[in-house]
Every structure is written in structure tokens, then in C-alpha cells.
Amino acid sequence: MSHVTLIGDRLASTGTEFVYEGESVACEGCPYRKQCLNLTEGVRYEITDVRDDGQLLDCAVHDTGVRAVEVEPTSVVANVATREAYAGGKAELPGSCPHTECPSHEYCVPDGAEFDTEYQIETVHGDPPHEHCQLDRELTLVEFKPPDTTSN
């Protein structure tokens, strides 16, 4: 389901993905709070449309202002334990990893997914980018289904 929100003008491009981090202290007293702070914290979104006819509004967070966009929750690609990697099944992230130089690190600690949270697997992609996990984990690359945010 699509949501209309405000986003920094530099980020306002169809296809841009971001994780909504919530309110900044600079948002206090802003007249656009209701239109801007209307997404679910920690969820990854994709901009599906930029309201070009919309006005560019001043913002204390974004130096070039904000504009209206349509966004939808989007999937998160992640590594999970191979034994849990079944399309339609549920899995959790395997746990934190200190090996930031590993080609799989962005999938072991993906933006838009939290540890100790179960996600539904939409697609199984297969082998992860790394050749060997330095933590000796057997991992498979999957895509988590976008969360249902209709309660927002």
C-alpha cells in the first residue's frame, strides 16, 4: 500500500530506497510533522512517485527542502541460516558480524531488518557473495517480504 510523505529534495527520485529512522530533534515545532513523520520506523521504503506538482517546503533537517513523494514498503535482501531458507517460510537474521570487509556483510546486517525479529521469506536467491563465512555460518541469500504497514 502506497503512503504519501515528505522527503528531502535531494533524495526525491523514483526508485530511491531508504530506511525510515523516525523523528529528528530538528522536527520539533515543524508545521509539516503530520505529513512527514507518518511512516513506520525501521522499515525500508522505495519511492514510487515524486509529486512534481507539489511545492518545495522549507525543512530544518534537509537543507534544500522537502517535497511530497509516494512510497511503498520494499523487500530486504539478507543472509539467513541455510536450514531456514525456504520460500514462504520464516527466518531471522543469524546475528551480528564484526567482519565489515566481507562481501556479505551488507546482507548479514541489512538496513531495514532487525535482529531477533522473524521475517517471511519471499524469494530464495541462493549462495551469498562470500566464499567462506568467517564465523562458520552456513548461509543462504534470501529476500524478505515487505512488512505490512497498513496500520499507519
Curated annotation (Swiss-Prot):
Transmembrane segments: none annotated. Pfam families: UPF0179 (PF03684). Belongs to the UPF0179 family. HAMAP family: UPF0179. This is UPF0179 protein HQ_3004A.
